[in-house]
């Protein structure tokens, strides 16, 4: 395949074979075989460069099209607008990740949150639904004591999630209570029962460490300063 004339002119110029005048442009062939080999290599290099550039652009366009699909953008969305939307979406995902982390990773302070999230009065379902969340020092009997506490309050566990990191634990539960025995004021009963449970956890840690090593961990503990009631 013969090289394109524009390629010949460009590389002939680089190798000194281009003769230009005000009226015409010609390409001269060198009788030197080494010069001919050099020109062939230069033209081959140019073709390789063009092919590599074509593939690079195709790869970039493919990635941009994938981003358009992910962000539900139409095919005519320009690159600058698309990239701005990508940056905004990444920021939103980062914020969501931080919020999820705050909800699942145990904090350094003892916390209790009791929320009345639903009042079911449809048909035979006459229950009050509470969402319970608390952080405290972990101990072997904690889960058992928690179940006994809920049982004593005549509450049924609908959902439970526990995360333990570095000796601290966060528990999130959704519990249901029968309206015959409970009302909105039951938030106070549940809160006080959990407060007692957390205090037992702290005492257990102190005794378990003989008042020594556990004392350092208890320095992280604060009073129950995050009690939320609705």
UniProtKB/Swiss-Prot annotation:
Report one GO cellular component.
Answer: nucleus
Q: Which UniProt keywords apply?
A: DNA-binding, Nucleus, Transcription, Transcription regulation
Extract the InterPro entries matched here. ACT-like_dom_sf, AIG1-like, bHLH_dom, HLH_DNA-bd_sf
Q: Which Gene3D superfamilies match?
A: Helix-loop-helix DNA-binding domain (4.10.280.10)
Domain bHLH as annotated: residue spans = 44-93
One GO biological process term is: regulation of DNA-templated transcription
Q: Does the keyword Phosphoprotein apply?
A: no
One Pfam match, given by its short name, reads HLH
Compartments reported by the entry = Nucleus
Q: Does the keyword Transcription regulation apply?
A: yes
Q: Which GO terms describe its molecular function?
A: DNA binding; DNA-binding transcription factor activity; protein dimerization activity
Query: What quaternary structure, including any partners, is listed in this protein's UniProt entry?
Result: Homodimer.
Q: What is this protein called?
A: Putative transcription factor bHLH107
Species of origin reads Arabidopsis thaliana
Q: Quick one: which gene encodes this? A: BHLH107
